[in-house]
């Protein structure tokens, strides 16, 4: 049985990934690594947790040794828009934190999952059907940390044999955890505002197409990649994965199929728009499909129906 540590376990992806890992591998075998925010609810009640500041290598090594960790899902990160406001913090957590994770993994024979992002691409990257292997050169600090992370993971595999694996996530949409400063967060906020107020002001411009994915598929991607036969993996790290691509008008139109009176206007955030304009419209995820069987379950229609159902239930119960 695996012994797993999840860093960034109270974040958008980490909180749901930790619970799913506990279901699959046993609650006591999955440790939630926390830093400034204490876990609540099921995350706190279903398994162990302890403070793990990934920028503190001694603290990280202690957690790995204490729980005899053999697999680290490294989710601790600073999101894109926040990273532009505090680039030093983004670098420290995004790069120095990952370096510590890889060093501890090397010393303790751990496998490492590292999530990269569509943010790893830049304005010179082909925006349509973005290839698996292509020029990147991002212009945001978030993107710089992700490209650096991809290269570090490749280096530690080639140089030291550390079993590093990772994906490039698109925007992630969740009905559980509220967003926290990402460029694609509007695609979560729009559902909540549609249910609560019947209207939404979008911070990205009409025609801004971005790759997106529903959280259940994002979680499956991480776990399935880590379970894949290593002999099948030609790339190992930074796999493009995609589930759907849309702009604000398309998602609004889908919501109107369920809430006919929904209205949307625009107040474009220049920081988020500048970042979004450099990201792919849609990535080519052929490598992930061929090498480890990537196959998302949700498209825009099925995701929208599920999002609105769950959020409406929360709203009716007074939870949001």
Question: Which role fits each region the language model picked out?
Answer:
Residues 54-93:
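NAD(P)H-binding glycine-rich loop region in Rossmannoid oxidoreductase-like domains
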Residues 74, 99-141:
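Conserved Rossmann-fold NAD(P)-dependent oxidoreductase catalytic core, especially the SDR/UDP-sugar
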Residues 135, 169-179, 189-213, 217:
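A conserved pocket-lining segment of Rossmann-fold NAD(P)-dependent short-chain dehydrogenase/reductase
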Residues 3-24:
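N-terminal Rossmann NAD(P)H-binding glycine-rich loop of SDR-like oxidoreductase domains
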Residues 117, 151-176:
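Conserved beta-loop-beta element that borders a ligand/cofactor-binding pocket
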Residues 122, 137-141, 165-185:
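Flexible, glycine-rich beta-alpha linker
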Residues 147, 160, 173-188, 215-216, ...:
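Glycine/proline-rich active-site loop of Rossmann-fold NAD(P)-dependent oxidoreductases
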Residues 203-205, 211-320:
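C-terminal substrate-binding subdomain of Rossmann-fold SDR/epimerase-dehydratase oxidoreductases
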């Amino acid at each position: 049985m695996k012994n797993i540590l999840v860093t960034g376990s109270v974040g958008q992806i980490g909180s749901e990934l930790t619970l799913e890992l506990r279901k699959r591998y046993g609650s006591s075998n999955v440790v939630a690594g926390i830093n400034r925010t204490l876990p609540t609810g099921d995350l706190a009640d279903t398994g162990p947790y302890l403070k793990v500041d990934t920028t503190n290598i001694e603290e990280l090594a202690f957690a790995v040794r204490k729980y005899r960790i053999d697999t680290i899902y490294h989710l601790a990160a600073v999101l894109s828009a926040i990273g532009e406001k505090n680039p030093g913090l983004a670098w420290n957590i995004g790069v120095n934190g990952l370096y510590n994770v890889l060093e501890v993994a090397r010393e303790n024979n751990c496998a490492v999952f590292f999530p990269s992002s569509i943010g790893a691409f830049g304005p010179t990257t082909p925006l349509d059907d973005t290839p698996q292997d292509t020029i990147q050169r991002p212009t945001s600090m978030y993107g710089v940390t992700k490209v650096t992370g991809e290269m570090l993971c490749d280096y530690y595999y080639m140089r030291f044999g550390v079993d590093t694996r990772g994906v490039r996530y698109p925007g992630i949409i969740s009905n559980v955890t509220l967003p926290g400063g990402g460029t694609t967060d509007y695609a979560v906020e729009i559902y909540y505002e549609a249910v609560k107020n019947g209207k939404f002001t979008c911070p990205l411009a009409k025609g801004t197409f971005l790759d997106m994915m529903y959280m259940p598929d994002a979680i499956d991607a991480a776990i399935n990649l880590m379970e894949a036969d290593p002999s099948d993996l030609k790339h190992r790290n930074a796999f493009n994965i995609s589930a759907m691509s849309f702009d604000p008008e398309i998602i609004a139109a889908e919501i109107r199929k369920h809430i006919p009176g929904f209205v949307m206007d625009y107040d474009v955030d220049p920081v988020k728009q500048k970042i979004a304009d450099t990201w792919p419209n849609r990535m080519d995820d052929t490598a992930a499909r061929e090498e480890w069987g990537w196959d998302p379950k949700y498209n825009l229609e099925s995701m929208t129906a599920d999002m609105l159902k769950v959020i409406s239930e929360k709203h009716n119960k007074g939870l949001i």
